[in-house]
Amino acid sequence: ELLAATGTGVAHCPVSNMKLSSGIARIPEMLRMGVKTGLAVDGSASNDGSNMLEEMRVAYLLHRLNSSSEAPSGYDILKMASRGSASILGREELGHLAEGMAADFFAISLDRIELVGGQYDPKSLLSCIGFKGAVDYTVVNGKVVVEQGRLVNVEEEKIVSRANAAVEKLLYIK
């Protein structure tokens, strides 16, 4: 009640909560009470993958398991991940597509065997069916940064090689 009354936002990080055994956030109750609720991946120390699409599906399934019919719908989870998270950050120009807003979005082709039927409920697809792998296109502030699943402004292979070298150096410090 205090969170709702004070306008305090909650960043829900279910994968981190599971990894750290820190419990299950009472998201269905928070949503009913009008608590501003977003979805986040926390950080690499407590969420090795930092994959927001995975976080959406995990949030959906976790609350279905824990809260059954009171659980947020797949579309509710999408709204938490987009508008909800933007609102918590005080960034009302983010989290939805509209004229004059930042054009940040991604696109995936539904022409994949694992997404068959997804076109009939696109608002719930990411939470209910889930999506693994690289998205087909990502646009940030109106500029394409991922095309056909690959970063367009950097050489991924070089980044991976440099990152792996840095990890090896950190792991084998003597």
Region spans (language model):
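Conserved strand-to-helix beginnings and helix N-cap segments that scaffold or border functional pockets
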Residues: 23-24, 49-53, 119, 157
